[in-house]
UniProtKB/Swiss-Prot annotation:
HAMAP family: Ribosomal_uL24_B. CDD domains: KOW_RPL26 (cd06089). Pfam families: KOW, ribosomal_L24. SUPFAM superfamilies: Translation proteins SH3-like domain (SSF50104). This is Large ribosomal subunit protein uL24. The keyword RNA-binding applies. The keyword rRNA-binding applies.
Amino acid sequence: MHIKKGDKVIVITGKDKGKTGTVIEALPKRDRVVVEGVNIVKKHQKPTQMNPEGGITEFEAAIHVSNVMLLDPKTNKPTRVGTKIEDGKKVRVAKKSGEIIK
């Protein structure tokens, strides 16, 4: 999976198409990511001892990694991710600009 926690991404398909945000959590086993402010869902919760109020809570649900693209750090446009070896270490590279990603 080429997307990591902390990456800036844009949603390319689905109901939130065009929205951008930062990856809060990456779930590589499920091929999903949680993006800040994207795919907001409501959950109805019964009152419990921990949460005596109960009610409806909103939170970000996971979105499939194929539905997001990394934003190029140089041009701020969607780009694919490649890898190259620099100083004996593998680094991620933006395909459009060749810029190294963190």
